[in-house]
Each structure stands twice: as C-alpha cells, then as structure tokens.
Regions:
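TPR/TPR-like (Sel1-like) alpha-helical repeat modules
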Residues: 58-59, 74-93
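N-terminal amphipathic/basic-hydrophobic helices that include classical n-h-c signal peptides
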Residues: 1-13, 36
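Terminal, low-structured helical/coil segments at or just beyond the last alpha-helical repeat
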Residues: 95-111
Length: 111
C-alpha cells in the first residue's frame, strides 16, 4: 500500500490522516517501522501486538512507544524507565494526545 523508504525503516510520504485511516485495514501498511506498527496495533486496540512491535524496535523510537504503552497499561514505573530510555520526559497528556504526538513525530522522521 505504502512503499518503504530508502532506509527500509518506515513509510514514504504517508500522512497522519492516511496512517489513522489505515487502522481500518486488517493489517498494518507495508513498510511501517516497528514503532509505528506498534502505534497502529494500539489504534486497533491490540495492546499485546503493539507491545511486541515496540519491543522489537531497539532504538529510541521503540522505547518511546514502549513508554506510552506501559503508561496506558497503568504501569507507571515501567513507563518512566522507558521514557528515560527514549530521552523523553514522562508524559502527562491524555493518551490520545500523546499517541498523535508520537505518530506525527515518527511519520516525520521516517518520511
């Protein structure tokens, strides 16, 4: 559906609205980074798959998504650990707002 960018780590020219609308599909768009796939699965309500994707992404992006997921789960101590690993302050925004912030940031980085 969306081509992989030259680094093979994300989508090419995918907008936020396209990403959000893609969550009606049965599977994530081809070429998503593991961090974005985690957020895609979270939008589908599948925390387990979201967490698995975040765990597979070894970098800062995966740590950020991992932090968000543990905060959403209610595991604040684990979330704080992952925010620190991601180099981000612990988020206090509503979950929807944080999800939007992370998705937009990762789409921008991976375009």
């Amino acid at each position: 559906m969306f081509p992989v960018n030259s680094t093979g780590t994300g989508t090419s020219k995918m907008t936020f609205d396209e990403f959000r609308l893609s969550s009606t599909a049965p599977a994530p768009p081809a070429g998503l980074s593991l961090a974005l796939a985690g957020l895609w699965w979270d939008a589908k309500g599948d925390w387990k798959r979201a967490h698995e994707s975040a765990q597979e992404e070894a970098g800062l992006e995966g740590a950020w998504v991992h932090a968000y997921l543990h905060r959403k789960e209610g595991d604040q101590d684990n979330a704080a650990y992952w925010y620190a690993r991601a180099g981000k302050p612990v988020c206090r925004e509503p979950f929807d707002a944080e999800w939007i912030t992370i998705v937009k940031s990762l789409l921008h980085r991976n375009s």
